[in-house]
Design a protein with these regions (language model features):
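A generic structural signal for well-ordered alpha-helical segments
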Residues: 49, 121, 155-156
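Oxyanion-hole/transition-state-stabilizing segment in secreted/luminal serine hydrolases
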Residues: 35-38, 69-111, 136
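Cell-envelope and extracellular/periplasmic
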Residues: 29, 61-66, 92-102, 157
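Catalytic His-Asp segment of secreted/periplasmic serine-dependent ester chemistry enzymes
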Residues: 134-215
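A general structural detector for well-ordered alpha-helical segments in enzyme core domains, enriched
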Residues: 41, 45, 79, 110-117, ...
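Serine-esterase "nucleophile elbow" of acetyl-processing enzymes
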Residues: 2-64, 77-86
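Active-site segments of SGNH/GDSL-like serine hydrolases
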Residues: 94-100, 117-147
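Structural recognition of the beta-strand scaffold that forms the well-ordered cores
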Residues: 22-24, 57-62, 89-94, 127-132, ...
């Protein structure tokens, strides 16, 4: 009896050479709060991320109004359950301005909390992309947040991790401010689109090691 012919791959078939799992930790804005399309900036980023030979899985682990200390206490226990033992594991940390509401808030303590997250991830061989906090309409709050944003940026830079500064370009951005005013302080469709644009154009593809889309 002649051997059965092997079925050829269908047109467009590609072999998945890279298996990537991304755990994204952050607050309610990471989860798309304020976006009437319920996609959020994170969904927009993922929609613009595809490459031949790459299988990407993502897991959103969001807690509203979370401080860096709270994030640091939970991220590994939650993210590690989503990570793979055989593929690539990556971490996205979306920071908020919640540390400003602490009674004994200080940039030094916030720096240490973020440093602990990045150091733990580095020890486990997990590349990290950090998205900095976004500005509000409260200028006095923004002045304090500017200091915190600079501290976060320094922590990430010292450890060679990618830091996307969302605060500086959005602080005086008319469309961002109009979106916050219309949404009761939350970014809407336009605001989430602006965050996504910053992430996509500030090192996302290089961090993942995939080519940028041509269109």
């Amino acid at each position: 009896m002649p051997p059965r012919a092997r079925r050829l791959p269908t047109k467009g078939f590609t072999v998945q050479n890279r298996q990537i799992r991304i755990a994204a930790v952050g607050d309610h804005i990471l989860a798309g709060a304020g976006d009437p399309r319920a996609v959020g900036w994170w969904g927009r980023v993922l929609a613009r991320t595809s490459a031949p030979g790459v299988a990407l899985e993502n897991y959103v682990l969001a807690v509203p109004h979370e401080t860096t200390e709270e994030l640091g206490a939970r991220w590994w226990g939650e993210a590690s359950r989503r990570f793979s033992e055989s593929g690539e594991n990556r971490l996205v940390v979306a920071l908020s301005d919640a540390d400003l509401d602490l009674d004994a808030s200080s940039s030094a303590r916030s720096r240490l909390n973020l440093a602990n997250v990045l150091d733990t991830a580095s020890q486990r061989g997990i590349p990290v992309l950090v998205l900095g906090p976004t500005p509000s309409l409260d200028e006095s709050r923004n002045q304090r947040l500017a200091e915190l944003n600079a501290a976060y940026l320094d922590v990430a830079d010292r450890r060679g991790q990618v830091y996307v500064d969302a605060f500086t370009p959005l602080r005086d951005h008319e469309q961002w401010r109009a979106d916050l005013a219309a949404g009761g302080g939350l970014p809407g469709q336009a605001g989430h689109g602006l965050i996504a644009w910053l992430v996509l154009h500030r090192g996302w593809y290089q961090w993942l090691g995939v080519p940028e889309p041509t269109a």
